Each structure stands twice: as C-alpha cells, then as structure tokens.
Amino acid sequence: HVFTNYNFKNAFEKKTFGKEIVSFAANANKKEVTFWNEFRPVPLTSEETTNYLKKDSIQTIRKSQVYLDSIDAKGNKFNFLKIITGYSYKNTHKKWSFNYQGVTNIGSGSFNTVQGYNLDSGFSFRKWNDETGKYTSISSTFNYGFSEDRLRVNGRYYHRFNNINNAYISVGGGSAISQFNPNEPISPMLNTIATLFFKNNYMKLYNKEFAEINYGQEVVNGIFASGKLLYENRRALLNTTAYTLVKNDDLYFSNDPLQPFNSASVPFDKHDIFK
C-alpha cells in the first residue's frame, strides 16, 4: 500500500510531548483474534496468517508442561557426587527452583589464620512470575572454620513486588565472619595463597551477629531510592592457627592491624551498633 497527501502540523504546543517515549496498555498482548480483525487497518496476507499460526503453535508447545518438564528433567538429574559438587532442581512450569551450592565449588573453600581452613555452602529457593514481575528468594549460607571449630549460619528473604517500579524488600540475619573493611577488598583466594605460601595473612576478621531489613523502589522514572536498617553485635577474633605450607621462622601477624606483633591483642571491645 502507498499512502499520499500527508497532513503535517507545522508547530506543536509546548506540552504536547512528555517524557514518555512508548507505553503499552495492560494485557495488550492478550487480545483475541476478533479484536485485531476489527482494529487492524490492513488485513493480513495469507503468508502472514500462516506465519502467525505456525509461531503460535510453536509457542504453545514450548509453554506446555510436557515440553517444559522434559527440558527440566535433563538438568534435574541427581547423583551422589552432587552432594559434594552441588545440585539444582528447576520446575519451569510452576516457576520455582532450588539450589544447593555444594562444598567443592571455586571459592567455597579458603584459609585464614582466624578460622584455618574453612568451607562455605548454602541453599536457596526461588519463585517467580513472568507476567507480574514478582520474584521471591529464600537463601541460607553456612560457613565452618576447622581450626576455630565454629559453624556460622545466616539467611535472607528477598521479594520483588513488580517490574513496574521494581519495589523490593529484603530481610536477613544470623552470624557471619567479616573483614574490617565492609567492602571486603581482599579475596579469600588471594588471602589463602598469600597466607599459606608466603605467611602474609592480610585479611583481618571479626565476628558479627546481625539483623537487617532493606526496602527500595523507583520513585520516579530513572530515580531509585532505598533505605536500610541494620543491627550488629560485633566481637573481635584472635588467630587460632599458625599452620603454613612454607617452613621458615617468620611469624604470622596478629588479627589486630593496630598491634600486628601482639598475638593476644584485640582491636576493639565487644559492642552493638544500629544504623
């Protein structure tokens, strides 16, 4: 079709155009065929009709429970080795998944002079809704230090309400071991190598029992606001091991960065913080 005799407007009022570039009406992609036949300005060609029918059939199959279950079954296979390496189970049709981290993933094991060798693992459960954008996750993390002989456990709940303003709430708590610098600039792997092979125990750690709640959302287009309430009970820790793979007369520094040569020194007293 060729269109001619366009009518162009030479000028528009100042408020004719807003910041909105494009918008979609709710359920715009859920209309029946009769709706499109009534409002479509140009009828579909036979080729277009055939193409849409083919794509609709493929989409129907790929969204069917039989098809989705068959795809999930390949990734959901379990064997006893996965108890060590980790395991994931997914139900795409019902939109949920479960994950176990295992204990042999990269980063799950490390070494520091406070805990000695330590392992991380955990579980997580996710539930989502593609139509509304809702998303919920529940996760837990376990950390055990062999020289320290202590297990630390913490958990977190996260819920996103929609994908319009991406409003979310997050609640967490438990016990954890943390670096003095909250940004945790020293990676566990780097510290493990530096400690075991060069006796440079850079990472300084403390224990925290904590509870926190976070909320955030997009308040206006492009501007996101969030808030956080946090409680922590902080306690200083001491080195519990002098183990190393390098045999020499060098000694480890203490876990107090202010008095590195005093192994019994603690950098701060036990205290609580709210922020």
List each model region and its residues:
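Gly/Pro-enriched, hydrophobic low-complexity segments
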Residues: 1-29
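Transmembrane beta-strand segments that form the barrel wall of outer-membrane beta-barrel proteins
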Residues: 96-111, 127-129, 133-157, 171
